[in-house]
A protein has these predicted regions:
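Structural alpha/beta core scaffold segments of enzyme domains
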Residues: 1-320
Length: 320
């Protein structure tokens, strides 16, 4: 509703959007599309109701929801002890013809966890967003950070080889200490908590890391390759609106409101502002309220409302 209203210079309280259950998307279907605006313009000029019909093949060959087309140049600066002193990323991000939905925002979102789990004092992000005649890009299997995390973690592996350090050890030397939180990373976002060394230790123990390295050594003696991947990443669970200023997004929060009512028979109705997306959000809401009121989960009914009736909301997306 916000996006549609912004295009026509109409305040949000004058736009009524009725969402429908739309299958799994993890937020990828939450943005505005060009066809939405076309429909509204057609309705305004023609004066008659307009229906947009699009099948799966049409969407797959002309709609958003495509994976990234990113071109990276990146480097790490380290001292002789394996401590990272700087991280630089130059990214050319091809968002296709229209960058529907959250395309440009996904380019900025890596700033929310730019230096990952590591205490890297300085960082640089040179971001160029381009439009081409390709299909529109949008959030897909993670809203921006996954390719960035891949680049950072590969650089950590390269550095480990050059310094003849174990991949786990170089990461351990660079983790943000657990007693340093809350911690502000170089891009300006604040982490509230974390114990990355304990998480690494748990993974190494569960995977019997030493035994894996022995197996790898024996395999190479026999002319076989056994790969072992070690990765430590952070996936931002909400949004860093400071980063979104890069692409002109407003610095608002991400509220999620709900209206709860209890009838004479002890049944609960909760009204939310988002439709089903296929990840079981309504089940979670029902379980939380059933536990809180001490009732059966079947005694809770979840209803989604239109944008004018619902409390302040954002809806599922961005790993939240």
């Amino acid at each position: 509703a916000l996006a549609r209203g912004a295009v026509f210079n109409v305040p949000p309280n004058k736009v009524r959007l009725v969402a429908q259950p739309h299958g799994g998307s993890f937020g990828g279907k939450g943005g505005a599309r060009g066809c939405d605006i076309t429909i509204l313009l057609s309705r305004k000029s023609g004066g008659r109701p307009v229906k947009w019909i699009e099948d799966r093949m049409e969407y797959l060959t002309g709609g958003a929801g495509q994976a990234w087309d990113r071109h990276y140049e990146a480097s790490l600066a380290l001292d002789k002890d394996g401590k990272v002193t700087g991280f630089r990323v130059k990214l050319l991000d091809d968002l296709g013809a229209t960058a529907e939905g959250w395309g440009a925002v996904s380019s900025a979102k890596p700033l929310a966890a730019f230096t990952g789990c590591y205490a890297i004092p300085t960082a640089q992000y040179d971001l160029t967003i381009v439009a081409t005649n390709k299909l529109p890009g949008s959030p897909y299997r993670g809203m921006g950070p996954p390719p960035h995390n891949f680049v950072l973690e590969r650089l950590m592996d390269v550095a480990a080889r050059k310094l003849e350090l174990d991949p786990g050890e170089i990461r351990r030397r660079n983790f943000i200490p657990k007693d340093a939180f809350p911690y502000t990373i170089a891009s300006g976002n604040e982490y509230d908590s974390g114990d990355y060394e304990a998480a690494l230790d748990a993974v190494l123990e569960m995977g019997d890391y030493k035994a894996l390295r022995e197996r790898q050594k024996k395999a190479r003696e026999q002319g076989r390759y056994l790969g072992i991947g070690l990765v430590n990443t952070i996936e931002p669970g909400v949004f860093d609106w400071n980063a979104y200023a890069v692409v002109g997004q407003p610095g608002t929060g991400v509220p999620e409101g709900a209206t709860v009512s209890l009838d004479l028979y002890g049944k609960v109705t909760v009204r939310v502002g988002f439709a089903l997306e296929g990840q079981g959000q309504y089940t979670v809401i029902s379980q939380v309220l059933a536990d809180y009121f001490g009732i059966e989960i079947d005694d809770v009914r979840v209803v989604h409302q239109d944008t004018l009736s619902a409390p302040p909301h954002f809806g599922p997306g961005g790993s939240r």
